Amino acid sequence: GNVVIRNTKDGTTIIAGNVFQDEVTERTLATYKPLMIIKQEADSIYVTADTLFTARLSDLYKAKDSVVKDTVKGTTVVTVNNNKKDSTNRYFEAYRNVRIFSDSMQAVCDSMFYSFKDSTFKLFQKPILWAKESQITGDTVYLFTKNKKADRVQVFENSFLVNKLDPEVYNQIKSTRMDAYFKD
């Protein structure tokens, strides 16, 4: 059936035909035409794929509490991992036929990783990104967002940018690595 999951902590909504959720580990797997909406101020980001998966970032990196012994004073300091309830302690992955839509840009790729910690979309397997009159391609594309808006892009291996200037005039840039910035 149709399932809707709203996470008010990180401002996301998942709509899918089928959802498997583990409330203990806070992992969610969505299939059958899943759609994730990342709520932003004026321009939300919509991500669709064959499969969406989301979980705690600290589980991915196995963040643990640590114990440190102070050899000078002979005391023990315990550092507790408080990321378990942090709203930025989330990531999501999208697999197969990934599509990203927003008012300012669109993208397609085969698979994607997004971390709420650094607000970076990592696009893999033949990614293509469109913004206004520009198209960017490469083997891997990192899309960095700042204040919930597209800020800059890093393109790795086989970078290519096409930018339309006039109806019959285009800029074309090809390189092994590219850094591009968005401006209003």
Q: PLM features: residue spans?
A:
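Structural signature for solvent-exposed beta-strand/loop edge elements and short helix-capping sites
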Residues: 1-184
